[in-house]
Amino acid sequence: MRIIFWGTPEYSVKSLEVLKKSDHEILAVITQPDKKRSRGNKLIASPVKQYAMKEGLPVFTPETLKKNDHFISLLKEFSCDLFVVIAYGKILPKKILDIPKYKSWNAHASLLPRWRGAAPIQWSILEGDDFTGVGIMRMEEGLDTGDVLVEKQIKIEKEDNLQTLTKKLSDLSSELLLKAISKIEQNKNKDINHLLKKQKDLQRKLKYARMINKSDYIIDWANNSTDIYRKINALYPRVSTTFKKKNLKIIKIKILTTDEIQNKNYKIVSDKFKPGYVIGLIENKGIIISTKTDPILLLEAKLEGKNISKQKQLLQQLNPLIGEKFSD
């Protein structure tokens, strides 16, 4: 099949790589324009562009898709069979979606219609979902509303964070794309509609995965410990608090149950403080912080100006005292 690939972040690279190594032909790659991503205002190409250029694939980075007749004419000249779209970063207008002979197809990182939208991986962890997955859908004008051709679910492990789950779903996307394209190719002279499942028939509750904003990255210690744990994993490694007026990124924590506190003879004073306070200091083990429910043990964090540090080193860097407050 003759394919034009649309994608931007690292998540998309695995699928492009797999397609490049397959029997299918990648005619061109469409990705977001280079952006200033580091100090010195240096322009950095997207991960997809970097891979495509390394492989000698034609790359296009349109600033806009609306009222861009020249670019639309260019797409039509390729006479491609499919558009494959994975985390491109912009909504494709219908007049672009309808260009390929066998339409445009998207790999979406959720079990649709649950978590339509921009941040499905983050929200599946934030909400404590037991399972997630990938669906390959035929694209239409609506936001992730298309009919599903193939899908597969995987379990979200308790220790999964944004990095680990993104890797699993990126790999799964590449696997399912090949299956989906094979089905499309096998039925290219037939009506494929009988192979598609409408999202309303998938018996899942519709939920939207809104974009993550700056305030989402701040820990509210008045939340319960489970919600704090999920936030740290879902938005890894960018969740933060403050301590002694310095920014502290929380990388990893452990929820301490009552039994564990008693069995390990941890001495804490949780009954004296509201959420967000240092309520225990364990030699060589770290800092215990109060929440709305169970206390948490700080395992890994990054103090501004420092590298990621573990428990003993954090004790030295922060020099905390019982009763000192986080997010001061």
UniProtKB/Swiss-Prot annotation:
GO molecular function annotations of the record: methionyl-tRNA formyltransferase activity
GO cellular component, one term: cytosol
Substrates-to-products reaction catalysed: L-methionyl-tRNA(fMet) + (6R)-10-formyltetrahydrofolate = N-formyl-L-methionyl-tRNA(fMet) + (6S)-5,6,7,8-tetrahydrofolate + H(+)
Keywords: Protein biosynthesis, Transferase
Domain of life of the organism encoding this protein: Bacteria
EC assignment: 2.1.2.9
Positions that bind (6S)-5,6,7,8-tetrahydrofolate: 110-113
Purpose: Attaches a formyl group to the free amino group of methionyl-tRNA(fMet). The formyl group appears to play a dual role in the initiator identity of N-formylmethionyl-tRNA by promoting its recognition by IF2 and preventing the misappropriation of this tRNA by the elongation apparatus.
NCBIfam families: fmt
Family to which this protein belongs: Belongs to the Fmt family.
PANTHER family named among the record's database cross-references: METHIONYL-TRNA FORMYLTRANSFERASE (PTHR11138), METHIONYL-TRNA FORMYLTRANSFERASE, MITOCHONDRIAL (PTHR11138:SF5)
Descriptive protein name: Methionyl-tRNA formyltransferase
